[in-house]
Amino acid sequence: MAIVSVKLTSNQVDKFLILWRPYLVHNNHNYAKYTFKIDGTLIIIYNTNTCTINTHDINSFLNTFLKREDLTLFNVIKQQVNTKKNNQNVMSQSEIYESAQVIIGSDEVGVGDLFGGIVVCAVSLKKSDFKKINHLKIIDSKKLNDQQMQEIYQQIKNQISYTIVSYNPKEYNELIKEYNNAHILKTILHYKALQSEIHKHAKYSIFSVVDAFSSLKNWNQYLQKVNFQPYEPNLLIPKAESIYTSVALASIIARVMFLKMIAIIEEQFNVKIPLGSSNPLVNDVASNIFQKFGLKILKQVAKEHFSNFQQIIKNK
């Protein structure tokens, strides 16, 4: 599913209502004027006349349900959709804030590292929060070094709302054996972090964004597998940290927390822990820990299902 946002005039909103009145559904959203559900597609028209269309295939939807009904309206929306496609087809922060008071973004760190577990952070930002953080020039964490992220975290940790959830390596290994799918573990943590922030901001209208690691279909299947209540983020999108400030901050905070997890391992074994999994130094350090302390201890600091972990214990 993808969300496309378009701006309508009052006359165009009236046309929508005439065309799709049979598809009107109830919506508790404080800022929603009309909500329609048409063959699996959700359309919300807000008080600002911003219209969001949540659908699997925007072109198919427009051609099927609008082109034959009102060609003029079809062309207006089609033009806006095509413009957005040229700009990655995503809603901007300013568009979201027209219809939501809080943007919650979540991201995870540690999934590609042999050592350490995984950390997920969800960050909530109201428009007013930007006054506190604009001077920091928040960008994609992949473009920041560890020192820069630490400095940003120290400046924002008491200024914004966020939730951190994690699995240490021992917990991670136990759950991987149970579910045999790292995506399920990530979904659990994202879900818990998002729900925590949603609960904190229950009186606000919320828009949630997750840095995508799976499709929405799989996300729902993972939640069903672990018997969690259904919840769909408003947007699952790759590289969300480069688009939405809340996700960028979530990535930074999660990275800082993951580095703290690594620092504990370093202190425990008095060794510098290399990050990643393909670096030859990773194998060297893991082999040394295995040889000195045994398999039980290695399982407490590293991800057991990684191929190099298996190779290390195989070559003992």
UniProtKB/Swiss-Prot annotation:
Q: Which GO terms describe its biological process?
A: DNA replication, removal of RNA primer; mismatch repair
According to UniProt, the reaction catalysed is: Endonucleolytic cleavage to 5'-phosphomonoester
Which cofactor names does the annotation list? Mn(2+); Mg(2+)
The UniProt annotation places a divalent metal cation binding at 107-108, 211
Say if the entry is tagged with keyword Metal-binding.
yes
Q: Which InterPro entries match?
A: RNase_HII/HIII, RNase_HII/HIII_dom, RNase_HIII, RNaseH-like_sf, RNaseH_sf
Q: What is its EC number?
A: 3.1.26.4
Pfam families, A to Z: RNase_HII
* Main EC class the enzyme belongs to: hydrolase
S-S bonds:
none
Q: What is its main location?
A: cytoplasm
Entry keyword Metal-binding = yes
Record keywords: Cytoplasm, Endonuclease, Hydrolase, Magnesium, Metal-binding, Nuclease
This entry's Gene Ontology molecular function terms read: magnesium ion binding; RNA binding; RNA-DNA hybrid ribonuclease activity
The record describes the protein's role as: Endonuclease that specifically degrades the RNA of RNA-DNA hybrids.
Q: Which family does it belong to?
A: Belongs to the RNase HII family. RnhC subfamily.
What is this protein identified as? Answer: Ribonuclease HIII
Q: Which organism is it from?
A: Ureaplasma parvum serovar 3 (strain ATCC 700970)
